């Protein structure tokens, strides 16, 4: 029994390593069939079983609606000897009325593989409010932001007002003002003479339903 358990753990490590290698190589995870072929498992149901156990152990995250959506957690990365790359979580920003900005890191978050080349220029914020719901940004979501001081019309940005308050809105530079446009038909835009762009939203993480 002990030998079987050891063999199962070894196979699961092989699965973890293969998923990691393929994401690093291609930018997206392998299919179940590709995993099976790589670790010498002919049955897709056996592969599914290994993935289910890895998920239960907290070593991977999966989206049941997307077959390829497999992601190693920080614990999964550490299991195969990889130190996860992280970006700072700088607190909360509003998608409604502007609120005071938070600049000190309250936590650190594993960086998605497709953004690792930009790791030093990224930070995360938790969104509060519902003014960006038409853009798919919900209350409680965490947005990944690339630090930059300029923006193109239509970009979703984190902007600082003259009162040192930050907000998440869609940016438009118009003739005599800057318009920070919410993505909610019930809300009016914010019109300002000047804003400071803290960064552009380049990704989103949701850990709630």
From Swiss-Prot:
The site annotation (Cleavage) covers 95-96
Q: Name one GO molecular function term.
A: DNA binding
Signal peptide range: none
**Keywords, sorted A to Z:** Autocatalytic cleavage, DNA damage, DNA repair, DNA replication, DNA-binding, Hydrolase, Repressor, SOS response, Transcription, Transcription regulation
Q: Which reaction does it catalyse?
A: Hydrolysis of Ala-|-Gly bond in repressor LexA
EC no. given is 3.4.21.88
CDD domains attached to this UniProt entry: HTH_ARSR (cd00090), S24_LexA-like (cd06529)
Q: Does the keyword Transcription regulation apply?
A: yes
| Summary of the function given for this chain in its UniProt record | Represses a number of genes involved in the response to DNA damage (SOS response), including recA and lexA. In the presence of single-stranded DNA, RecA interacts with LexA causing an autocatalytic cleavage which disrupts the DNA-binding part of LexA, leading to derepression of the SOS regulon and eventually DNA repair.
Q: Which family does it belong to?
A: Belongs to the peptidase S24 family.
Q: Note the subunit structure.
A: Homodimer.
This chain belongs to the protein called LexA repressor
Record organism:
Enterococcus faecalis (strain ATCC 700802 / V583)
Q: Lineage of this protein's species?
A: Bacteria, Bacillati, Bacillota, Bacilli, Lactobacillales
């Amino acid at each position: 029994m002990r030998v079987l358990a050891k063999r199962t753990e070894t196979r699961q490590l092989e699965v973890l390593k293969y998923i990691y290698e393929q994401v690093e190589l291609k930018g997206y995870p392998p299919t179940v069939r590709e995993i099976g072929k790589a670790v010498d498992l002919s049955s897709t149901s056996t592969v599914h079983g290994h993935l289910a156990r890895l998920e239960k152990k907290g070593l991977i995250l999966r989206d049941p609606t997307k077959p390829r959506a497999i992601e190693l957690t920080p614990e999964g990365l550490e299991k195969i000897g990889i130190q996860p790359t992280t970006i700072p979580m700088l607190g909360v920003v509003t998608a409604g009325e502007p609120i005071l900005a938070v600049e000190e890191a309250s936590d650190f978050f594993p960086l998605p593989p497709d953004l690792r080349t930009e790791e030093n220029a990224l930070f995360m914020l938790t969104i509060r409010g519902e003014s960006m719901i038409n853009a798919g940004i919900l209350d409680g979501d965490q947005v990944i932001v690339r630090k930059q001081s300029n923006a193109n019309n239509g970009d979703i940005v984190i902007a600082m007002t003259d009162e040192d308050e930050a907000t998440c809105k869609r940016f438009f530079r118009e003739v005599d003002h800057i318009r920070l446009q919410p993505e909610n038909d019930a809300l009016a835009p914010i019109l300002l003479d000047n804003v400071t762009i803290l960064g552009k939203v380049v990704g989103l993480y949701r850990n709630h339903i």
